[in-house]
Amino acid sequence: MTEPIIELKNIDVTFHQKKRTIEAVKNVSINIERGDVYGIVGYSGAGKSTLVRVINLLQEPTSGSVTVNGETFFQADSQDAKKTRIGTNDLRVRRRKIGMIFQHFNLLNERTVTENVAFALQHSKLKDDEKKAKVAELLELVDLSDRAEQYPSQLSGGQKQRVAIARALANDPEILISDEATSALDPRTTNQILALLKKLNQEFGLTIVLITHEMQAVKEVANKVAVMQNGEIIERGSLLEIFAQPKQQLTREFIETATNIDKAIETIRHEPLVNELKEGEIFARLSYVGETTDEPLIASLFRDFNVTANILYGNIEVLQDTPVGSLLVILSGEPTQVQTALSTLHDHHVEVTILKGGN
């Protein structure tokens, strides 16, 4: 097993505001391996942005330990314990290897695209001509070479975010933190930015920490996911595990935003076929991972049990090269045979949720 590039252990972040104490992050531990695109999902106030700001100590934790690239940035075993912290100058150097992009692009309005990207190189040891070449290379990477001398006011939201990405990459970081970077963008532009992030990960091995409230964004680029609520991680796993077998209600809610299966169920419930189920008919959801509900299995229900499957809706996602999907079906046949068919589906690792009928 490879050593994590980011290791957060027992992180607590507590804020004291007048007479209030706010526990923004509560005893969170997380390991992110080199080359991961790690999605951290949660609604506003869940603590996800506070947590990732701990990585480069923009937010110092109240307690816990922060290790990046095998180097301890911070350690305090409890709130009252003596703190060990990396020196200010050393931290400044290490931060150059951790790029960040945000929902608001934080560009300098009075500077051109080229000058905005070059700003990140002001403390670089590169010579002027090397800096110029570096900026040109970055603008080509984010497909903005033709906008080099324009100002932020002349750019679209997506173009501004591309400038921010180029600037974040200027010092050749090993880690890129994306904090709600697509939240202010339209769906088409969001997909373009996500595609760029995926390219950076795949072609350059960039480790990306993706903070978002949009499960669709996670689905597009992440290989691992953690779900946060009230300062805690309530569920984590590979993208495939989270989508195929969500354990928490909040996780299921997020997945619904990326699949719309619940919306399909509510719509189909009102169809005459479902409203007027006959004896021996069941309206059910079949959930599966892999090739377990390919056409021969569905067809075998009729061949082996004389049970027909009327498919009303299907949704299939390919996650980490594995099909994950749901079918909404009406199963019809003799009640005992329908039950036998359901058992057969279960034996083939198909999760069956009966939505109506079968009493």
UniProtKB/Swiss-Prot annotation:
ABC transporter domain location is 8-255
**What molecular functions are annotated in GO for this chain?**
ABC-type D-methionine transporter activity; ATP binding; ATP hydrolysis activity
Q: Which Gene3D superfamilies match?
A: 3.30.70.260, P-loop containing nucleotide triphosphate hydrolases (3.40.50.300)
Its membrane topology is listed as: Peripheral membrane protein
Binding residues for ATP: 42-49
Name the catalysed reactions. L-methionine(out) + ATP + H2O = L-methionine(in) + ADP + phosphate + H(+); D-methionine(out) + ATP + H2O = D-methionine(in) + ADP + phosphate + H(+)
Q: Origin, by domain of life?
A: Bacteria
Disulfide links within the chain: none
* Enzyme nomenclature, EC number: 7.4.2.11
InterPro entries, alphabetically? AAA+_ATPase (IPR003593), ABC_transporter-like_ATP-bd (IPR003439), ABC_transporter-like_CS (IPR017871), ACT-like_dom_sf (IPR045865), MetN_ABC (IPR041701), MetN_ABC_transporter-like (IPR050086), NIL_domain (IPR018449), P-loop_NTPase (IPR027417)
> Where does this polypeptide localize?
Cell membrane
The entry's cellular-component GO terms read: plasma membrane
Record-linked SUPFAM superfamilies:
ACT-like, P-loop containing nucleoside triphosphate hydrolases
**Keyword annotations for this protein?**
Amino-acid transport, ATP-binding, Cell membrane, Membrane, Nucleotide-binding, Translocase, Transport
Report the protein's function.
Answer: Part of the ABC transporter complex MetNIQ involved in methionine import. Responsible for energy coupling to the transport system.
User: What protein family is recorded?
Assistant: Belongs to the ABC transporter superfamily. Methionine importer (TC 3.A.1.24) family.
**Oligomer and partners:** The complex is composed of two ATP-binding proteins (MetN), two transmembrane proteins (MetI) and a solute-binding protein (MetQ).
This protein's name: Methionine import ATP-binding protein MetN
Report the source organism.
Answer: Leuconostoc mesenteroides subsp. mesenteroides (strain ATCC 8293 / DSM 20343 / BCRC 11652 / CCM 1803 / JCM 6124 / NCDO 523 / NBRC 100496 / NCIMB 8023 / NCTC 12954 / NRRL B-1118 / 37Y)
Recall the taxonomic lineage recorded for the source organism: Bacteria, Bacillati, Bacillota, Bacilli, Lactobacillales
